[in-house]
């Protein structure tokens, strides 16, 4: 099985190996998905810049892919990673650090 990219982008939920903490949500197009498989590092598609980006390329906070899980509809993916440094550009471990309730 492989992701269905018929709509162009799929959500990629990134979780930390071991803790299973949700680190971030980003989007992949087919090219980002293929580069992730090839390099075993996370690649995403930036909707604002309309280009590919490699997590940690400039910050050094890289993500090493341990496993990938495809959902039942083949239109979203969970990326299980070994995270180096914080995942969030703010310096927080995870992008999900604002508690609402």
From Swiss-Prot:
Protein location? Cytoplasm
* Pathway assigned in UniProt: Amino-acid biosynthesis; L-histidine biosynthesis; L-histidine from 5-phospho-alpha-D-ribose 1-diphosphate: step 3/9
In the UniProt record, does the keyword Cytoplasm occur?
yes
Q: Which GO terms describe its biological process?
A: L-histidine biosynthetic process
Cofactor(s) the protein needs: Mg(2+); Zn(2+)
One GO cellular component term of this record is: cytoplasm
Binding residues for Mg(2+): 71, 73, 75
**Residues annotated as binding Zn(2+):** 72, 88, 95
| E.C. number | 3.5.4.19
The reply on keyword Acyltransferase is no
Keywords for this protein: Amino-acid biosynthesis, Cytoplasm, Histidine biosynthesis, Hydrolase, Magnesium, Metal-binding, Zinc
Q: What is its main location?
A: cytoplasm
Q: Which InterPro entries match?
A: PRA-CH (IPR026660), PRib_AMP_CycHydrolase_dom (IPR002496), PRib_AMP_CycHydrolase_sf (IPR038019)
Classification via Pfam families: PRA-CH (PF01502)
Listed GO molecular functions?
magnesium ion binding; phosphoribosyl-AMP cyclohydrolase activity; zinc ion binding
Catalysed reaction(s)? 1-(5-phospho-beta-D-ribosyl)-5'-AMP + H2O = 1-(5-phospho-beta-D-ribosyl)-5-[(5-phospho-beta-D-ribosylamino)methylideneamino]imidazole-4-carboxamide
How are cofactors bound according to the entry's free-text note? Answer: Binds 1 Mg(2+) ion per subunit.
Subunit structure, as described in the record: Homodimer.
What's the stated role of this polypeptide?
Answer: Catalyzes the hydrolysis of the adenine ring of phosphoribosyl-AMP.
Kindly give the HAMAP family that the UniProt entry links to this protein.
HisI
Assigned protein family: Belongs to the PRA-CH family.
Specify the protein name: Phosphoribosyl-AMP cyclohydrolase
Species name: Bacillus cereus (strain ATCC 14579 / DSM 31 / CCUG 7414 / JCM 2152 / NBRC 15305 / NCIMB 9373 / NCTC 2599 / NRRL B-3711)
Q: Which gene encodes it?
A: hisI
